C-alpha cells in the first residue's frame, strides 16, 4: 500500500530549494543540504537576519546566500523542529510524521530567537547542569553554543556532554573546564557564571593551531603598490593593480590549501570544490588580518591618487554601496576585536570547511573537520581571553558577514571596483588615523 511519504518522495524535488530530494526529512520532502541546514539551525538555536525584504529566492544555487529566508521557508513549508533529536545526533524522533502547520506568530518567535530563549530559560531553571547544546557547522553560518563555567554545580564536570564531544573532535582527552548553557545569548543573561579563573590550552589545540600557522604565508605581498608623489592613477591602472593583487592572493590560498594538516584527508575534487567556492572569502579574511598593513597602507595610498569621474560616481550601484558599507563594518569589527593570528587561522579553516557547498562528496568528513577547528578556536579564545566571554561568538558571527560580502561582490560591475575600494580604504584609513 502506497503511503503519503512514498507519493511525495516520487516527486524527487526539495520543497525548499528545488534540488534533488533524498527523502522525507523532519516532515517534508527535502534534499540533504536543507535537511542539514534546518537541523543545525534548530540544534544551535541560530538567529539570522535578511538584508533585503525577507523574500529572497530559494534555489539550489542561491539557497546559501540568505540563511534567514532559507530557515523561514523551512518553517513555512512545514519542517518540524520537534522531530529533531535533542542531542542533535542522526535519527529523528518520528520518521513517519508529516509536515506541521505553525502560525505566523510562532514562526516569528523562532526566527527572532525568542522561542529559543524561553525554552532555554525553562531548561535552565529545571536542570541547570544539563547540556543542551550541540555544535554545528561554523562556516556556512555562525556557530554559537555558549560555554561558561557553573561554579555552583555540585555534579562532576565530566557529566557534561562537552567532554566526549571535545575528545571526539580534538582527539585527545583533557580536563573539563566549563559547561554549556543552552544558547548563545546566555552570556548576558547569566553574568555571574562567566569563568574568571585561568586555565591551560588543550595540547591538541596547541598542535592544531601551530599546524595552521605554519601553513599560512606571512611574507609581504610582492605586488608593487608604491606610487611616486604627484602621480594621478587612472581607473584602468587601479583596476589592473587590483587584478594583479587578487591573482597573488588567490595563488597564496591555493598554496595554503596544499599545506593544510588535513590535506590528505579529502579528495582533490572536494578541495577544488571548496576552494572554488570560498576563495573570495579567504582573500577577504587574509586582507583583514595577515596583509592588513599593506592593504590599508600601501594600497590605500594608491587608491587615494585615483580621482573618479562624475560619470563613475553617478553610475555607482546599490550593490556596490551595500558591499562598501558592510566591508567598513567588518573592518571595524576586526579592528575592535584585534583578531589574533591564532584566531584568524582557525576562522579561515572553519570558513573553508563548509559542508553545505554543492558538489562535495565527503560531506561528513568535511563536517567533522569543521567541528574540530570550531572547538580549537573556542578553546583558544577562552584560554587567551578568559575575561571576554563573548569573544568566540563575536568571531564566529563575523563569518556569515564575510560570506555575504563575498557573495555580493560578484554582483558589482567590474568597472566599479576601483571606486568601491577607494571609498572603502579611505574610510578605513581615516578611522585608523582617528584612533
Swiss-Prot record:
Protein name (record): Nuclear receptor subfamily 6 group A member 1
One GO CC term, this protein: nucleus
Subunit details: Homodimer.
Zinc finger region(s), NR C4-type: 14-34, 50-69
Low complexity bias locations: 142-156
Residue pairs linked by disulfide bridges in the UniProt entry: none
Gene Ontology biological-process annotations: animal organ development; anterior/posterior pattern specification; cell migration; midbrain-hindbrain boundary development; neurogenesis
Protein localization: Cytoplasm; Nucleus
Region feature (Disordered): 84-157
Residue range(s) of DNA binding per entry: 11-86
GO terms for MF: DNA-binding transcription factor activity; protein homodimerization activity; sequence-specific DNA binding; zinc ion binding
InterPro entries reported in the protein's UniProt record: NHR-like_dom_sf, Nucl_hrmn_rcpt_lig-bd, Nuclear_hormone_rcpt_NR3, Nuclear_hrmn_rcpt, Znf_hrmn_rcpt, Znf_NHR/GATA
Bias (Polar residues): 121-141
Family affiliation: Belongs to the nuclear hormone receptor family. NR6 subfamily.
Protein's job: Probable orphan nuclear receptor. Binds to a response element containing repeats of the motif 5'-AGGTCA-3'. Required for anterior-posterior patterning during organogenesis. Acts with chordin to play a role in patterning the midbrain-hindbrain. Isoform Em is required for integrin-mediated cell matrix interaction during neurulation and for the morphogenetic movements leading to formation of the neural tube. Also mediates the effect of retinoic acid on primary neurogenesis.
Location of the NR LBD domain: 204-435
SMART domains hit by this protein: HOLI (SM00430), ZnF_C4 (SM00399)
Gene: nr6a1
Entry superkingdom: Eukaryota
Keywords for this protein: Cytoplasm, Developmental protein, Differentiation, DNA-binding, Metal-binding, Neurogenesis, Nucleus, Receptor, Transcription, Transcription regulation, Zinc, Zinc-finger
